[in-house]
From Swiss-Prot:
The keyword RNA-binding does not apply. Its EC number is 1.4.1.3. Belongs to the Glu/Leu/Phe/Val dehydrogenases family. This is Glutamate dehydrogenase. It comes from Pyrococcus endeavori. It catalyses: L-glutamate + NAD(+) + H2O = 2-oxoglutarate + NH4(+) + NADH + H(+); L-glutamate + NADP(+) + H2O = 2-oxoglutarate + NH4(+) + NADPH + H(+). It is an enzyme of class 1 (oxidoreductase). The gene is gdhA. The keyword Cytoplasm applies. It is found in: Cytoplasm. CDD domains: NAD_bind_1_Glu_DH. InterPro entries: Aminoacid_DH-like_N_sf, GLPV_dehydrogenases, Glu/Leu/Phe/Val/Trp_DH, Glu/Leu/Phe/Val/Trp_DH_C, Glu/Leu/Phe/Val/Trp_DH_dimer, Glu/Leu/Phe/Val_DH_AS, Glu_DH, NAD(P)-bd_dom_sf. It comes from the Archaea. Homohexamer. Its main location: cytoplasm.
Amino acid sequence: MVEQDPFEIAVKQLERAAQYMKISEEALEFLKRPQRIVEVTIPVEMDDGTVKVFTGFRVQYNWARGPTKGGIRWHPEETLSTVKALAAWMTWKTAVMDLPYGGGKGGIIVDPKKLSDREKERLARGYIRAIYDVISPYEDIPAPDVYTNPQIMAWMMDEYEAISRRKTPAFGIITGKPLSIGGSLGRNEATARGASYTIREARKVLGWGDLKGKTIAIQGYGNAGYYLAKIMSEDYGMKVVAVSDSKGGIYNPDGLNADEVLKWKQEHGSVKDFPGATNITNEELLELEVDVLAPAAIEEVITKKNADNIKAKIVAEVANGPVTPEADEILFEKGILQIPDFLCNAGGVTVSYFEWVQNITGYYWTLEEVREKLDKKMTKAFYDVYNTAKEKNIHMRDADYVVAVQRVYQAMLDRGWVKH
């Protein structure tokens, strides 16, 4: 796990970005603090008749650009510092994608594996009752995150509707819902699909002809890792030569079939020992000689210890925070093109935005329309960041921050919250 305080890291990253832009001291001070922090107590009746008390959080980091947006995490080690940091990062992510949102995040300190489905439902509904006064389709829009899913979002939306006594617009109170109650097509694949568009554009700026026959290694084979393997091989003709999960990885220089590997993982609990592939460690996967490396699992896997051994030409950060600041510098010096996490994995929040738009208007799009709109958003954001990096001769992560913070700062100036 990460040893540094997450919110301290978020503030340091903001301060670093501020060096590359003109921003007033007062605005920077404002941006280092969340606009609203809510801590709630949620009593839940357990199946055995006893009552357990849970602590929940909702942080609305900055709403200069619009309603705050961000997931709800259920985790036994959830902390307010983590929720604040993630809310700050959501602020920058929505800004770099130019979505009309601010950033938010929610969390409950709970081990969901120890709860029955009925207990989960009571906790979900209790959380919404507790934060009801600070959320709405026009104020703060939650979504699924760690250990929460479309079913939990459905219970939460239903509770919000019951309290508000409103129907259709209330669909937009939460995104990541099941399709039957206002979910969007394309949401499952959104993170990977968005990442694929940024990889496509990255190869253009590197002057590659196309991606056919190029190699990719993917660390992590959850939702994003699987969909990325499938999309890059089937739509772009890339060779997925290695994938891994928490138990280890597999390598086949001739390429792996995404669906067959997923089936094997579901049957055996891991991708390891997949027929026709060689078992490798997660550490070995990162250092393979491939064209594209996509860390899609956990944070801080590329550090100053192994950054010098990275041989990929593109590092696509599908996970949150997979590269440490020290490693950023090393990759930059080596001439490796990084697609930073706020940009690379922003397909998820972008399709969440599309879901909200469809809910508010009551008009639903086809899968092709969702993909086409996502492509436009991701491509524009990629060049906003890439051109800023080139212009200022800074690496992509710093450019990502500069683009995002500048947009939030401009909104704060226009509202009269701060001065130049």
